[in-house]
């Protein structure tokens, strides 16, 4: 994942709101929001998590898109010196036991509310933990220095955590209806078509941001395609891009 930190100011907030359909002005300190980097046609360059920290914004980007995302943000902020922090790792611990396990490694972490974060300490290193994740389960994401990432994971394992792969993550996020960029959403899919209108702040729908004209039009007039969940009746796997029919073609997996 890519991690970008941008010094907070009212001007920066205004500029970020031109490319994100999120109300950043009412974002509380240490609160996170799911958002999108918007395209002129209403499509999505990438989905992301933005957190308002005390004196800066933290933006978590998808690894496959991070360089393109970074350039878009640089251009909007007119700051070509803005860069990714490559000295940090991002670790996720998810599931119903995540709170108990993580509490045995970092004290008081269980007090965090969903989509909120705080600074903590691990082996005399400052780390930032948010109560978030992409599995539909309770969980936490930890931003920490690379030099302590392995020892942090080893601590989690010693307290009862188990390593999982992307297959397990993918199953969980599908069951929770969470999108994966490049599969369920892309540059030609709008938040409305992706059934992600909830992620557009209500007070921004009639506001100006990149792609806002198309978004408003789709909300008012409806869309010809819409992401929905389906449940197969048999054990046959519904693979990505499989065509869906009844008396005629209805869509794709």
What are the language-model segments listed below?
Residues 1-38, 43, 167:
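Acidic, proline/glycine-enriched N-terminal capping motif
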Residues 47-49:
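Short, surface-exposed charged micro-motifs
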Residues 52-253:
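Conserved, structured C-terminal
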